[in-house]
Amino acid sequence: MATLAAGLGGCQTMSDITVSVASNSEPGPNADPQRAVEVYGDRHRANPKDAEAALAYGQALRANGQRAQAAAVLEQATIANPGNKALLAAYGRALADNGNFQQAFDVLSKAHSPDNPDWHILSVQGTTLDQMGQHEEARRYYTSALKIMPGEPSVLSNLGLSYMLSRELPKAEEVLRQAYADPKADARVRQNLGLVVGLQGRFAEAEDIVKKDLPPDQAAANVAYLKDMLRKDNPRSGGRKPVPLAQLSRPD
């Protein structure tokens, strides 16, 4: 499937790994994901109950696309370290990566508290609700996150996609343009805005937006894919195809 319509919660990067580097033999933040899996995996196996080692290994597995294994490692770590909120947050994210949205939401609820909420976790909880079709409830979580971190583009992007998923495209565009205007907005925000603009039939404008992060031929291919998808989306066929899913931001 084209990049413009990438899967929800697109793949994580090595920037997810925030633990400190203890020696030159360990991978840095831009290291090869497979190398990180090997190094942090060795550390974890040497001391399976160590919370920091499990967290680093789980995040490395997520970055390398090994989602089920990441969830399994982090689940065991939360059992060995009950109440560790960093591990609960990572485990919840891994569950969401793996498509276990209700379980992810429940675990993430334990990773922070109403008297000390974490905007990152609120935003991820919103994405899990959106993926279960609970869009109104999801937006309450995004709104709470934005009260803590006003104007945060990753949260605004998720809020915009929530409106897209319920086919409120003008509202989705309005919110995504707020995110797009922020200098901190990343490629996901731009791709998501391009998607929403394209879904409204403004293909040339959509291509201009997405080609800022993609080679011209890839941007054109994505827009062509979107045109073809919309052309085939005929209500008279007896059913309506779902809106293509974009990239929800899961800040870590």
Tell me what each language-model feature is:
Residues 56, 90, 123-124, 158, ...:
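Canonical tetratricopeptide repeat
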Residues 15-19, 183, 187-189, 196-252:
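Terminal, low-structured helical/coil segments at or just beyond the last alpha-helical repeat
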Residues 46, 80-81, 111-115, 148, ...:
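Structural marker of alpha-solenoid helical repeat scaffolds
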Residues 2, 7-56, 60-64, 72, ...:
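N-terminal leader/linker segments that initiate helical-solenoid repeat arrays
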Residues 51-52, 85-86, 118-120, 135, ...:
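Helix-start (N-cap) detector for alpha-helical repeat units in TPR-like alpha-solenoids
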